[in-house]
Amino acid sequence: ATVPLTMDGLDLQKVAGTWHSMAMAASDISLLDSEYAPLRVYVQELRPTPRDNLEIILRKWEQKRCVQKKILAQKTELPAEFKISYLDENELIVLDTDYENYLFFCLENADAPGQNLVCQCLTRTLKADNEVMEKFDRALQTLPVDVRLFFDPTQVAEQCRI
């Protein structure tokens, strides 16, 4: 992974529950630049499984309608890193979380590190928090790839709701 692991440990039970995609960033704008872009997904819920994997419930636009998807993130030896199978992305790395307000994560293709990197800022409420957004921006600056923040789902009417 090109994404530095900054989390010492991740308490999966504490990340459980409802989340909202508050901001998105990517190394390649085309991954997110339209409502049908492949990695423009809206996280809804994180559900830890009994085997310490993480089930991610998300929504995205497909064929002019909003659909719900479920992705299984499988644990690795590293507490904040998971293997996933979603398009070409096969790694999910939790950058930072305080469990109660925010969680930052990135998706990466481990076979082509640094080429396609998409990161999201999740929050527990839909209220935009400048402090959290600044923290997310700082977290993005620690990445070895130039990742630009350019999409704020809260400002966009097309946010996918079911």
Swiss-Prot record:
GO terms for molecular function: retinol binding. Keywords: Disulfide bond, Milk protein, Retinol-binding, Secreted, Transport. It is found in: Secreted. CDD domains: lipocalin_beta-LG-like (cd19416). The keyword rRNA-binding does not apply. It comes from the Eukaryota. Disulfide bonds join 66-160, 106-119. Pfam families: Lipocalin (PF00061). Its main location: secreted. GO terms for cellular component: extracellular region. PANTHER family: GLYCODELIN, LIPOCALIN. Lactoglobulin is the primary component of whey, it binds retinol and is probably involved in the transport of that molecule. Belongs to the calycin superfamily. Lipocalin family. This is Beta-lactoglobulin-3. It comes from Felis catus. The lineage of its organism: Eukaryota, Metazoa, Chordata, Craniata, Vertebrata. The gene is LGB3.
